[in-house]
Design a protein with these regions (language model features):
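Short, small-residue-biased leader/transition segments that mark boundaries at the very start
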Residues: 1-4, 8-15
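Glycoside hydrolase catalytic-domain context in secreted enzymes
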Residues: 11-228
Length: 228
């Protein structure tokens, strides 16, 4: 939806029936919806693993943050994924500024996940750390609960080196296991969604609904001489 904040907010709010309210599902999540990529993740594509996006406070508040705010406050998404790039000098997957907005300002209670291999980018592409252990420290210290990639395999090494406060690990574990409990993964198939048979997957009525959604979601703009 480009940079149109209203379209962004409208589309992301549609995930509200997956959120934490639990009003008609016994308190269980149907799925753990994730909002991504936080934040100012708009390219350039070829440079996204090392790019530093500069956005002033006005642009952040009016353009880049409203959709995420709607996801957190209205849709109550369970997860937020950090972007590959830096925003105003801070890597998005370990940004104190973005975490302050997300948790302190908006009240986000779910877990934060890195984009795939984004934490490896800290030392390989952004060059803001020198080693995987330093990257792990930076990410955990700044609220990245789970790493899509393999860099968190260095957590134990970082602990042995005295680089990591184990309280950071405990905090992340609480968030991650909270999501699993909300999904009913420890409740022995007692959630309302366990009764849905596998035959519902790609059944005719669902395929038709997906086709209808795609067909009716297309917008064709008429050229009234604006373009050559």
């Amino acid at each position: 939806y480009g940079d149109h904040r209203d379209l962004h907010s409208f589309s992301t709010r549609r995930s509200s029936d997956l959120g934490r309210d639990g009003s008609d599902n016994g308190g269980y999540l149907r799925a753990a919806a994730c909002a991504k990529h936080f934040a100012v993740h708009s390219g350039p594509e070829a440079l996204r693993h090392s790019f530093d996006a500069q956005a002033d406070p006005k642009d952040m508040e009016e353009t880049y943050l409203p959709a995420f705010e709607a996801c957190v406050k209205e849709a109550k998404v369970e997860a937020v994924m950090g972007a590959y790039n830096r925003t105003n000098g801070e890597v998005c997957c370990a940004s104190p500024s973005l975490q302050k907005i997300l948790r302190a300002k908006w009240g986000f209670e779910g877990h934060f996940v890195s984009d795939c291999w984004a934490i490896r980018d800290f030392h390989e592409n952004h060059k803001i750390t020198a080693t995987p252990e330093e990257s792990v420290k930076l990410a955990l210290e700044n609220g990245c609960d789970i790493n899509c990639g393999c860099t968190y395999q260095k957590i134990l090494d970082a602990v042995k080196l005295g680089m990591i406060d184990e309280a950071w690990i405990n905090e992340s574990c609480v968030r991650l296991f909270t999501t699993r409990y909300l999904l009913g993964l420890f409740d022995d198939e007692k959630t309302p969604y366990d009764a849905i048979p596998f035959t519902e997957v790609e059944c005719e009525k669902n395929l038709e609904l997906a086709h209808r959604a795609a067909r009716e979601g297309i917008v064709l703009l008429k050229n009234d001489g604006v373009l050559p």
